[in-house]
C-alpha cells in the first residue's frame, strides 16, 4: 500500500514517477497483474522512501533544536 499520492505532497521527481506508474496501469490493465509495471513501482517506492527519510531527518533536526532551546535557555545577564 502506498502513502497518499497527491501531487502537492511530493517532489517533482516523485510526481513524474507516480504519473508514469499510473499511466502504465492505465495502458496495461491486464499485464500489470503479471508484473509489467513493477520496475516503475520500485522506482516510485524508492523515491517516496527517500522523501520520507529527508522529511524525517529534517523533523528530527528541528525537534532537537527546539528541545535544546527549551531545556537550555540562554543565560540572562544580570546588571
UniProtKB/Swiss-Prot annotation:
Q: Domain CHCH: where?
A: 11-55
Q: Which residues form the signal peptide?
A: none
Q: Where is this region: Disordered?
A: 58-79
| The organism's place on the tree of life at top rank | Eukaryota
Taxonomy of origin reads: Eukaryota, Metazoa, Chordata, Craniata, Vertebrata
Compartment annotation: Mitochondrion
Q: Matching InterPro entries, A to Z?
A: Cyt_c_biogenesis_Cmc1-like
Cysteine disulfide partners in this protein: 14-47, 24-37
Tell me what this protein is called: COX assembly mitochondrial protein 2 homolog
Q: Which UniProt keywords apply?
A: Disulfide bond, Mitochondrion
Major location category of this protein:
mitochondrion
Q: Report the GO terms under cellular component.
A: mitochondrion
Described by its record, this protein's role is as follows: May be involved in cytochrome c oxidase biogenesis.
The species is Bos taurus
